[in-house]
């Protein structure tokens, strides 16, 4: 047997091994691919984006809270004034009493604030991925601005303005003396802009089988 014969057989063997690997992948695709293929999302994956928005909302809430804490400190206000106002929906006016210094309650207020942000994150991320996926950063920021302003108006003046007095006998959250309207709006805008900036973190990239690779 000549060297050329051996080289030819080795080349043929390499071809057969490659063919065997391809056939194994096809068998795997036939055995498991039907289920995977039916599950794989080819359109809009609402469950994924809602879950991703839940996580991204936590990040955005932390950023907006830090923005408010730093801003309040620079302005010579109580760093946790936002949380105190937030806690009036439950504790009433005593949450704003300077003598109120319950560390656990304030910590729980921060937790509830972040939890609210996680829920809002679902709304923001679903809308952004559904309607602003091809808009670029500037487009997403514009969408986030509109959503944030709409959420602020709806929550503060469409819901809280009448619900808090009804339940707790006061309207501290919409009282400009306690929380100026522009501070509340700016907090919502920072949340929305953060959602627009970290939007790529929550994009879905479907898994592709080896046989589907180009």
Mark where each language-model region is.
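Juxtamembrane/disordered regions of integral membrane proteins
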Residues: 2-214
């Amino acid at each position: 047997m000549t060297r050329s014969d051996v080289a030819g057989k080795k080349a043929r063997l390499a071809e057969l091994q490659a063919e065997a690997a391809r056939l194994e992948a096809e068998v795997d695709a036939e055995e498991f691919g039907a289920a995977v293929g039916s599950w794989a999302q080819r359109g809009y994956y609402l469950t994924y984006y809602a879950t991703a928005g839940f996580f991204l909302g936590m990040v955005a809430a932390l950023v907006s809270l830090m923005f408010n804490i730093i801003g309040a400190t620079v302005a010579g206000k109580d760093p946790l004034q936002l949380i105190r106002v937030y806690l009036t929906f439950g504790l009433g006016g005593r949450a704003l009493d300077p003598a109120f210094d319950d560390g656990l309650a304030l910590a729980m207020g921060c937790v509830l604030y972040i939890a609210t942000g996680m829920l809002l994150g679902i709304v923001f991320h679903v809308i952004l991925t559904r309607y602003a996926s091809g808009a670029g950063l500037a487009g997403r920021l514009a969408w986030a601005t509109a959503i944030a302003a709409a959420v602020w108006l709806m929550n503060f003046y469409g819901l809280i303005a009448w619900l808090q007095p009804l339940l707790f006998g006061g309207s501290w959250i919409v009282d400009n003396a306690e929380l100026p309207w522009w501070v509340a709006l700016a907090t919502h805008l920072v949340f929305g802009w953060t959602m627009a900036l970290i939007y790529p973190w929550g994009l879905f990239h479907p898994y592709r089988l080896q046989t589907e690779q180009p």
